[in-house]
Amino acid sequence: MFGCLVAGRLVQAAPQQVAEDKFVFDLPDYENINHVVVFMLGTVPFPEGMGGSVYFCYPDQSGMAVWQLLGFVTNEKPSAIFKISGLKSGKGSQHPFGAMNLPQTPTVAQIGISVELLENLVQQTPVANAAVSSVDSFTEFTQKMLDNFYNFASSFAVTQAQMTPNPSEAFIPANVVLKWYENFQRRLTQNPLFWKT
C-alpha cells in the first residue's frame, strides 16, 4: 500500500504493519538523511473518506521514541516529500503510536503511517520545517541576491541636495534601480528561466 524513499537508497515497499491501521518503515543511519518521500504504491487505495498521517520517529538521548507529525497522503495526494534533517532535535507531538512498543535503536529512526479519517487529517498541524519548499534553490538564490543588491545599493542613496559634485563618479538615480529590481522580480516570478532566452 505504501512506499518510502530516501535519496541514494533502495525504495522500501514493504512497511511493517504494527496494527490494523498503522505501518512503520525503518530508516537506518537516519542522521545522514535530509528528505524522505512517502507515497502510495497504487495497488490499494485508501477506503473512501480515509487518508494516512505521516510521522517521523527518532530516539532521543535517553533512547525514548520522539514522534513528530510530518503531514499526510491521500488518494488525491498520493505522495509527499518531507524534510527531516532539522527535526532531530525538536519536541515530540501527539501521535497514534503511543501504546505500541516499537523497538528503538540509537541509529534507526522510523516513518509511521496511521490510516485516519480525512476530516481528522486536515485538522492536524504538522511540525514546522517538515514541508519542502516549492521554490527551487536557484529561484530562491536569485531572489535573495536581488534583495541583497537592492538593499545594498539603497543604503548609499542620498538626496540631490546631499550630493557633492565629483566629475569622476557616475550617479544612478535610486528610482532606476528600483524599477530594474521590480521588473526583474516580475519576470522571475513569471518564468524563473527567462534569463536563458
UniProtKB/Swiss-Prot annotation:
GO terms for biological process: cellular response to heat; protein import into nucleus; protein transport. The keyword tRNA-binding does not apply. This is Protein Hikeshi. One of its GO terms (cellular component) is cytosol. GO terms for molecular function: Hsp70 protein binding; nuclear import signal receptor activity. Its main location: cytoplasm. The gene is HIKESHI. It comes from Gallus gallus. Pfam families: Hikeshi-like_C, Hikeshi-like_N. It is found in: Cytoplasm, Cytosol; Nucleus. The keyword Protein transport applies. PANTHER family: HIKESHI FAMILY MEMBER (PTHR12925), PROTEIN HIKESHI (PTHR12925:SF0). Keywords: Cytoplasm, Nucleus, Protein transport, Transport. Belongs to the OPI10 family. Acts as a specific nuclear import carrier for HSP70 proteins following heat-shock stress: acts by mediating the nucleoporin-dependent translocation of ATP-bound HSP70 proteins into the nucleus. HSP70 proteins import is required to protect cells from heat shock damages.
